[in-house]
Amino acid sequence: MGVLSASSLLCIAILAGCSPAPDGTSTTTAVPTGVSVQLGQNRDQYAGRSAIVRIENGSEDDLVIVGLEVSGSAFTATTDRDRASAVPAGQTKDLSVELPPAACGTAASDLRADVTLHLEDGAVIAITAVADPTAVLPRLHGAECTVVGVDRIADVTAESSVRLEGSGPSTVAVLTISVTPTGRRGRLDLVELRSTVLLKPAPDASTPTDASAWPLDRTVDATSGPKSIDVRIVPTRCDPHALAEDKVGTRFPLVVRIDGGPEAVMTLPLPAATATALKDAVRIRCG
């Protein structure tokens, strides 16, 4: 077992006689046999552009990656990762990256991420349209570009304080969503706020116990004044793992329509203090 070199990579790529690449030069080559690369995202990365590039090294040689670039039609720029990472033969490693800003002018059907790997000895592996088995690209592109469209028309955010109604096992948290128009042209329809793995609508006379979203039914344009929307919240579950294992329980999907277009989903902006207050309300109700 050895380290995969530029010359051995090139031999794999063209199946021809090879000689070592000169010191200090780079050799661009195909992905070696047994090595696969794909884009992914862990649950705790959903809040932003953080992602992983998964390298599965099924070859007989170690890979030493000293640089990684992500670019492509899905993005407006290129991101660079210049930390060295070894991927031993027969192993898989996830390399964390911060993806570039989304290219909102690119159609969803044309989204592509390209990955370039720089190896320790100067070899360069370029992968066009890297595999995206969990649909990271359309999810991030849709969310980020929806935020751009919403921000053009209004500032939509959760307020920093949470009001509590009732006490003990009857506690209900009341979250206020504030909507402040920017005065710029456009129409924003706030359709609904969806529940999370941790939080759901509080049942009442008009809300069944199995409700999975809060209907908002608000429209905002340049002539609108500021609006406030209250949503009443209770825990989705009270088992011991609900809070201990939570990573996305306060990330509410907000469904909107921009300028009469199709429904789109973004995450409701939520101050850290508000997220903490909501989790405290869960502790109070669950005991």
Short names for language-model regions:
Residues 19-22:
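Bacterial signal peptide processing site
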Residues 14-17:
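C-terminal motif of bacterial Sec signal peptides marking the signal peptidase cleavage site
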Residues 38-48, 162-171:
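Short, solvent-exposed loop/linker segments at the N-terminal edge
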Residues 102-143, 238-273:
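Terminal connector regions
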Residues 73-105, 200-241:
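Intrinsically disordered, low-complexity Pro/Gly/Ser/Thr-rich segments with frequent PxxP/GP/PP motifs
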Residues 61-69, 107-110, 126-128, 184-194, ...:
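Short, hydrophobic/aromatic beta-strand segments
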Residues 58-61, 103, 179-185, 237, ...:
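Short, acidic/polar linear motifs in exposed loop/turn regions
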Residues 121-212:
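Surface-exposed beta-loop interaction hotspot
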